[in-house]
Curated annotation (Swiss-Prot):
NCBIfam families: rpsB_bact (TIGR01011). Keywords: Chloroplast, Plastid, Ribonucleoprotein, Ribosomal protein. Belongs to the universal ribosomal protein uS2 family. PROSITE patterns: RIBOSOMAL_S2_1, RIBOSOMAL_S2_2. It is found in: Plastid, Chloroplast. InterPro entries: Ribosomal_uS2, Ribosomal_uS2_bac/mit/plastid, Ribosomal_uS2_CS, Ribosomal_uS2_flav_dom_sf. GO terms for biological process: translation. The keyword Signal does not apply. One of its GO terms (molecular function) is structural constituent of ribosome. This is Small ribosomal subunit protein uS2c. GO terms for cellular component: chloroplast; mitochondrial small ribosomal subunit.
Length: 236
């Protein structure tokens, strides 16, 4: 895998608050190599390590995108939800930003059935099929469609398991991470000072609470994916 330059600037990361970890009482000792100091009761993340692993992650997603691989971005907490959907749409990735339904990947056959149902209902709605039904039946189907849109809207075009999963907040998305580990799907995870850095294939130490920090990390990964996709289109 070729190393590339991704213009990851330490001062820019500081302005985004990427270096602010959790309180010193709320930490995982395995994160010690990624912490540079304690300040006013919180751990400070070593941004040199952040830059190194973010760069590695960018190389990985660029390489995968240049070979036509598929990505899934997962971030369901309120602060991350909008950022995740916008980033995924920009990079033409699948995403989950409301709730991770247990077994979404490990029980893929069930997820596929839900997606087929979702597509059928969307077709019915577009062709005004609901209007031909009794009001009560139409209302039931509309509620079903609304629920499926909420939870599966970001993966409606997914036809198989993703090649790489990007996780925003390891603690929040632990179930998704475990499913990826079970299936052997490579993962890139944004990890704060309360996380285990040994679980994901590439762990990026960073503040997972600040919107600016999450945006910074996502923007770099999305740029790398878009560059890789351009390379794939040019070479195909």
């Amino acid at each position: 895998m070729t190393k590339r330059y991704w213009n990851i600037d330490l001062e820019e990361m500081m302005r985004a608050g990427v270096h602010f970890g959790h309180g010193t009482r709320k930490w995982n000792p395995r994160m010690a190599p990624y912490i540079s100091a304690k300040r006013k009761g919180i751990h400070i993340i070593n941004l040199t390590r952040t830059a190194r692993f973010l760069s590695e992650a960018c190389d990985l997603v660029f390489d995968a995108a240049s070979r036509g691989k598929q990505f899934l971005i997962v971030g369901t907490k309120n602060k991350a939800a909008d950022l995740v959907s916008r980033a995924a749409i920009r990079a033409r990735c699948h995403y989950v930003n409301k709730k991770w339904l247990g077994g979404m990947l490990t029980n893929w056959s069930t997820t596929e059935k839900r997606l087929h149902k979702f597509r059928d209902l969307r077709t019915e709605q577009k062709t005004e099929g609901f209007n031909r039904l009794p009001k009560r039946d139409a209302a039931v189907l509309k509620r079903q469609l609304s629920r499926l849109e909420t939870y599966l809207g970001g993966i409606k075009y997914m036809t198989g398991l993703p090649d790489i999963v990007i996780i925003i907040d390891q603690q929040e998305e632990y179930t998704a991470l475990r499913e990826c580990i079970t299936l052997g799907i490579p993962t890139i995870s944004l990890i704060d000072t309360n996380c285990n850095p040994d679980l994901a294939d590439i762990s990026i130490p960073a503040n997972d609470d600040a919107i600016a920090s999450i945006r910074f990390i996502l923007n770099k990964l999305v740029f790398a994916i878009c560059e890789g996709r351009s390379s794939y289109i040019q070479n195909s």
